[in-house]
Amino acid sequence: MPSSKKKKEDVPIASMAGLVRYYESEKEKVKISPKVVVVASIVLIAGVIIASFIIPPPL
């Protein structure tokens, strides 16, 4: 391992002037297809529009 990389890993977090340290390995997360997100958004928008016609706003 190069010495410059080793020095960067040994730097304490408090002395990094407020920089956030992100780790290389990510935890497994729920993966959703972009198509599912778009379709769900359209369905939600349509539901809100339909509900606004069915249920009148309070006076």
Swiss-Prot record:
Membrane-protein topology: Single-pass membrane protein
Localization, UniProt: Cell membrane
Keywords assigned: Cell membrane, Membrane, Protein transport, Translocation, Transmembrane, Transmembrane helix, Transport
All ranges on the Extracellular side of the membrane: 57-59
Transmembrane portions of the chain: 36-56
Chief subcellular location: membrane
Intervals, Cytoplasmic compartment: 1-35
GO biological process: protein transport
Top-level taxon of the source organism: Archaea
GO-annotated cellular components: plasma membrane
Similarity comment text for this entry: Belongs to the SEC61-beta family.
Subunit structure: Component of the protein translocase complex. Heterotrimer consisting of alpha (SecY), beta (SecG) and gamma (SecE) subunits. Can form oligomers of the heterotrimer.
Biological role stated in the UniProt entry: Involved in protein export. The function of the beta subunit is unknown, but it may be involved in stabilization of the trimeric complex.
Protein name: Preprotein translocase subunit SecG
Species of provenance: Sulfolobus acidocaldarius (strain ATCC 33909 / DSM 639 / JCM 8929 / NBRC 15157 / NCIMB 11770)
